[in-house]
């Protein structure tokens, strides 16, 4: 009689263990999900701090106490639990450049939003924009390359045309000196008879032959006193009248 009781008890123990453990696990999972849902009701602490500073718009910067009060009023958070996270966010934000500390040190003092915070958001959302910019840049480069090739071809054509014009101008200049040389050869032939005529015209103007007789006359005139001297010589001989003195 004892054996059938044991056999009946054995199947009862096996189903009791399995259903008891399964509902405990199922009951634990919704609590964890609820905790996760509660934690995800607010954005990251640094983003809340930046939003509080930009909303308050204080000239000298916002203090940690005012940032906490703004977060408690606008977000579903428990500041007693979140206070250490706010201090950590302030320190890390100043170190990374997302926040700028105007006065104070550490988590105390006044804070402003840094200039590095905006570019970070742009980088997160600009993954597709980067691809578009890369495509646009490639298209622009291709257009610039085509335009540069066209410009180079146009410049080459212009240079070739200019070279042809220069060659034609040089050929014309080389032909022109031949005509000038022929003209220069003709000019001396015309001047040669003029030079021969000039001495023939000047020869009759000079009256050297007429002046020669005047000189001869002058010479003859000068010689006349010599003849007078010859005539006077007999007078000198006549002075010898010594016999007249003797007669006295």
UniProtKB/Swiss-Prot annotation:
Primary localization class, coarse: nucleus
H15 domain location: 41-115
Subcellular location: Nucleus; Chromosome
GO molecular function terms listed in the Swiss-Prot or TrEMBL record: DNA binding; structural constituent of chromatin
GO biological process: nucleosome assembly
Biased composition (Basic residues): 9-39, 118-248
Tissue: Sperm.
Keyword DNA-binding included in the entry's annotation: yes
InterPro entries noted in UniProt: H1/H5, Histone_H1/H5_H15, WH-like_DNA-bd_sf, WH_DNA-bd_sf
Matches recorded under CDD domains: H15 (cd00073)
Gene Ontology CC terms: nucleosome; nucleus
Cleaved signal peptide residues: none
Keyword Nuclease part of the UniProt annotation: no
Region (Disordered): 1-46, 115-248
Keywords linked to the UniProt accession: Chromosome, DNA-binding, Nucleus
Family assignment from sequence similarity: Belongs to the histone H1/H5 family.
Biological role stated in the UniProt entry: Histones H1 are necessary for the condensation of nucleosome chains into higher-order structures.
Protein name (record): Histone H1, gonadal
Native organism taxonomy: Eukaryota, Metazoa, Echinodermata, Eleutherozoa, Echinozoa
């Amino acid at each position: 009689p004892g054996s059938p009781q044991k056999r009946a008890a054995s199947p009862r123990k096996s189903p009791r263990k399995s259903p008891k453990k399964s509902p405990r696990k199922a009951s634990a999972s919704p609590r964890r999900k609820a905790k996760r849902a509660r934690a995800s009701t607010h954005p990251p602490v640094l983003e809340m701090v930046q939003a509080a500073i930009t909303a308050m718009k204080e000239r000298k910067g916002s203090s940690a106490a005012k940032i906490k009060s703004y977060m408690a009023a606008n977000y579903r958070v428990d500041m007693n639990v979140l206070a250490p996270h706010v201090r950590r966010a302030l320190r890390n934000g100043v170190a990374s450049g997302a926040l700028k500390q105007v006065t104070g040190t550490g988590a105390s003092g006044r804070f402003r939003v840094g200039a590095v915070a905006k570019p970070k958001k742009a980088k997160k959302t600009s993954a597709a924009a980067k691809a578009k910019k890369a495509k646009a840049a490639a298209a622009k480069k291709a257009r610039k390359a085509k335009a540069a090739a066209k410009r180079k071809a146009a410049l080459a054509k212009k240079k070739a045309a200019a070279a042809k014009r220069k060659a034609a101008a040089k050929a014309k200049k080389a032909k022109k000196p031949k005509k000038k040389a022929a003209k220069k050869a003709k000019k001396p032939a015309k001047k040669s008879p003029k030079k021969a005529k000039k001495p023939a015209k000047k020869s009759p103007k000079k009256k050297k032959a007429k002046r020669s007789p005047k000189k001869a006359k002058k010479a003859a005139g000068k010689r006349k006193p010599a003849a007078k001297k010859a005539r006077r010589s007999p007078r000198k001989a006549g002075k010898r009248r010594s016999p007249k003195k003797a007669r006295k």
